[in-house]
Regions:
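Short, ordered loop/turn segments at secondary-structure junctions
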Residues: 36-37, 90, 197, 221-224
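Histidine-rich, glycine-flanked metal-binding segment
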Residues: 1-28
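Short, charged, surface-exposed secondary-structure boundary motifs
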Residues: 30-31, 112-114, 226-229
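Metal-associated gating/positioning segment near the N- to mid-region
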Residues: 25-88
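Catalytic core of soluble alpha/beta enzymes
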Residues: 203, 222-231
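Polyanionic/metal-chelating signatures
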Residues: 78-216
Length: 231
């Protein structure tokens, strides 16, 4: 080691790496599941096992602290080759809202993760509002986030004043943590994952990406082939 003899032995057995006989099974690198509810939803139909939504926060809602490393879904997913995952909250009432986190699925109580690494949203059909309204609301939220600077988020008191003076922030009843996340979106180039399918919606998202210089990821995109040249 480093040009020096580290160990002498009379034994002819050479110490090497551990050999595991997989008995002809296929071996692959660990897979990453990029869109899951692993660790935050156990049984979808049982509300007491769901930690994926909030009635208070919108943009700044984080599921990270609710992650359950003992989830029964973890060993099942690991047996199918998934060793890490990005868990996402259910979309809030806002077209942009909710923070997703990356987790290593090792079932250890000392959770190995990257907290609040992505912001999520949606653009498309909604039972209560039109696409045009959702798109306008999304753009208003982005404009508000882009207008923020470091002094604006210096304290919760300052943030409360910013919210009070903003029609869109007041209308959405944003909280301090919501505003801080919107600041992060632009200051830290936080990835923004928007779920959308229609070709026209995808084009609108591309326009928003260019206008606001977003680190945009379009999820779903069933009609992406129709606008492949623009993508």
């Amino acid at each position: 080691e480093n040009g020096l003899i580290k160990k002498l032995s009379k034994s002819s057995a050479i110490q090497g790496d551990i050999v595991i006989d997989v008995e002809g099974k296929i071996v692959t690198p660990g897979l990453i599941a990029p869109d899951t509810e692993i660790g935050i939803v156990e049984i979808g139909a049982l509300s007491v096992t769901r930690d994926d939504e909030s009635n208070i926060y919108d943009v700044g809602f984080s599921i990270h602290s609710a992650f359950n490393p003992n989830s029964t879904l973890i060993p099942w997913n690991r047996s199918n080759g998934i060793t890490s995952a990005i868990s996402l909250p259910r979309n809030t009432s806002s077209p942009i809202g909710g923070l997703g986190s990356f987790f290593l699925l090792d079932s250890k109580m000392n959770i190995n993760s990257n907290a609040d690494m992505v912001l999520i949203g949606r653009l498309g059909a909604s039972g209560s509002s039109s696409r045009a309204e959702n798109l306008s609301l999304m753009e208003d939220i982005l404009s508000f986030g882009l207008s923020l600077n470091k002094k604006d988020i210096a304290s919760d008191i300052t943030i409360d004043e910013i919210i009070e003076n903003s029609s869109i922030a007041s209308y959405l009843d944003l909280k301090a943590r919501d505003v801080k996340v919107l600041y992060r979106l632009f200051d830290e180039d936080l990835p923004l994952i928007i779920k959308s399918h229609r070709a026209s919606d995808i084009l609108n998202l591309i326009s928003l990406k260019k206008k606001y210089d977003l680190n945009l990821v379009i999820m779903g995109a069933q009609e992406a082939s129709l606008v492949i040249d623009d993508i």
